[in-house]
Regions:
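Short, high-confidence coil segments that cap the C-terminus of an alpha-helix
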Residues: 92, 138-140, 168-171, 264
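Hydrophobic/aromatic residues located in beta-strands of well-ordered beta-sheets
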Residues: 54, 95-97, 143, 174, ...
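Conserved alpha/beta core of the MobA/IspD/sugar-nucleotide pyrophosphorylase nucleotidyltransferase superfamily
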Residues: 138, 218-302
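Short phosphate-binding loop-to-helix
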Residues: 96, 102-163
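Terminal signal-anchor or tail-anchor transmembrane helices
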Residues: 4-44
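Conserved core of the sugar-phosphate nucleotidyltransferase
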Residues: 153-246
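N-terminal glycine-rich phosphate-binding loop and ensuing alpha1 helix
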Residues: 45-98
Length: 302
């Protein structure tokens, strides 16, 4: 129904109704303009998405590597090494470990970390971050999901994805990629990513993407490896658990595909991807522990 009907009378109840509707439209427009003014003010003043918490989700019952957060890496539990690296990031106002396991909680409290106990019903790290966020006393604008199996995570990567999200008001999710090593091309535990010309994620896969018709790895192509860290706008994080699981997410067992497949990238809020130069050293399976310890010894990292 149009706001202004040419056949409407200019007097009486019809006129009153017309002016009320017109008044509502004017007030709504003014509210939008005022909101935009404050939005731009916060962007310029550096207060947009300014309160940031880092959450390290950790569970004991991993199907591929049970007890992984507590595995010893050169004298320290892996979860402690991840926490110590995260503490070096300048963008985080607070860091907590989110877990459903008392052994992990006791270990983390022992080296000084704040711990939030979460349900054992969380289906992935993102849902665990959301539950932990709801239990924190302070309110935050951005949550950084720091994977507990990245004991050598670079603080610059954490700061980089936070800045990417702060600089992209149309995005609700940011993550990072790096160059894929040829030897990791066929490894399903190394998640690959393809990105559009504007720096937004197109797809993630455990298989090699893109895949050429020869079936061989092209040594000239810049394949990308997804790093196990991501940040979310907290408003989006609150609705993430309510998004229905998707076929691609379930087939690949990759939670970020639920965001893309539910249409956020294409229609409303794309997933921002930043590329960083980083030699990834995540621990997915027990065999990775020796690799990372050798890497640390070679570079005198303790």
């Amino acid at each position: 129904m149009p706001i202004c009907d040419p056949s409407s009378s200019s007097t009486g109840a019809g006129s009153t109704k017309l002016w009320i509707i017109h008044g509502v439209a004017v007030v709504a427009a003014a509210a939008l303009a005022l909101g935009a003014h404050y939005y731009m003010f916060y962007r310029r003043s550096g207060e947009f998405r300014s309160r940031v918490v880092g959450i390290i989700p950790a569970r004991f019952a991993s199907s591929r590597f049970e007890g992984k957060p507590l595995v010893n890496i050169l004298g320290k539990p892996m979860i402690q090494r991840t926490w110590e690296r995260a503490k070096m990031a300048t963008s985080l106002d607070h860091i907590v470990v989110a877990t459903d396991d008392e052994k992990i909680a006791d270990c983390c409290r022992g080296f000084g970390a704040d711990v939030v106990m979460t349900s054992d019903l969380c289906r992935n790290g993102t849902e665990r971050c959301n539950e932990a966020l709801s239990k924190l006393d302070k309110r935050y604008d951005v949550v950084v999901n720091i994977q507990g199996d990245e004991p050598l995570i670079e603080p610059e990567i954490i700061d980089g994805i936070v800045k990417a999200l702060q600089a992209a008001p149309d995005a609700v999710f940011s993550t990072a990629v790096t160059s894929l090593k040829p030897e990791d091309a066929r490894d399903p535990n190394r998640v690959k990513c393809v990105v559009d010309n504007h720096g937004y994620a197109i797809y993630f896969s455990r298989g090699l993407i893109p895949f050429n018709k020869s079936g061989n790895v092209n040594p000239q192509f810049p394949y990308l490896l997804h790093l196990g860290i991501q940040s979310y706008d907290t408003k989006f994080l609150n609705i993430y658990p309510e998004l229905p699981p998707t076929p691609l997410q379930l087939e690949e067992d990759l939670e970020q595909l639920k965001v893309l497949e539910n249409g956020y990238k294409m229609k409303i809020v794309p997933m921002q991807v930043i590329k960083v130069e980083h030699e990834a050293h995540g621990v997915e399976v027990p065999e990775d522990v020796d690799k990372i310890e050798n890497y640390m010894r070679e570079r005198n990292l303790h």
